[in-house]
């Protein structure tokens, strides 16, 4: 019998409570870090230190959540084992095949929603907000160290702090805000694909044409071809040298003719 199998239902409950308190502690630590990051009075050094601590705290929270789920499972197993020993049939409903199927389906959906929630948190990170800020046409200068969320996004997020806030309404605003960004990106994508693609193709053809013309002019002027101006000038210089050579070897008269002796 292993240590987990030998635990009583009471001991399992104690383990579960301890894991729950540990998860709560990690969660409160993360909330403290997020409060510091959201405080505009926080200094740059404090913000940098808080950002460095955040990944480790998040990892500890994930690990404690895993342990908490495992302890819940062990507690349930200990409860069923104790009920079996005492002769109670409180698990009769669980042993119903239909109930087991519903339980499995519910657990599967819960696990899928959890993964989707974690993925959503990653997608709604600072990188996405930076992309939103960059997409604003009124922003001409973008500084990484002085980045702040857009005013519209900041206004929506601040509504979460109000005590009488309708969370679903704020969630709908964020969803609508992100949908508008997606629609704008889709619009620009369609314009780039259909409206600007033909223009770009035409400009590319013209550019290639003039590039070829420029290369031909360069070859005509400075190329090594026999008909290039460079070769023609070299031939002219060579002919001049050949013409001037006899005048240096033989005497000439006043009119420039060679004097024959």
From Swiss-Prot:
The keyword Nucleus applies. GO terms for biological process: cellular response to azide; DNA recombination; mRNA export from nucleus; stress granule assembly; transcription elongation by RNA polymerase II. The keyword Transcription applies. Keywords: Nucleus, Transcription, Transcription regulation. InterPro entries: THO_cplx_su_Thp2 (IPR018557). GO terms for molecular function: nucleic acid binding. It comes from the Eukaryota. One of its GO terms (cellular component) is THO complex part of transcription export complex. Component the THO subcomplex of the TREX complex, which operates in coupling transcription elongation to mRNA export. The THO complex is recruited to transcribed genes and moves along the gene with the elongating polymerase during transcription. THO is important for stabilizing nascent RNA in the RNA polymerase II elongation complex by preventing formation of DNA:RNA hybrids behind the elongating polymerase. Present with 2840 molecules/cell in log phase SD medium. Component of the THO complex, which is composed of HPR1, MFT1, THO2 and THP2. Together with SUB2, TEX1 and YRA1, THO forms the transcription/export (TREX) complex. THO associates with DNA and RNA in vitro. This is THO complex subunit THP2.
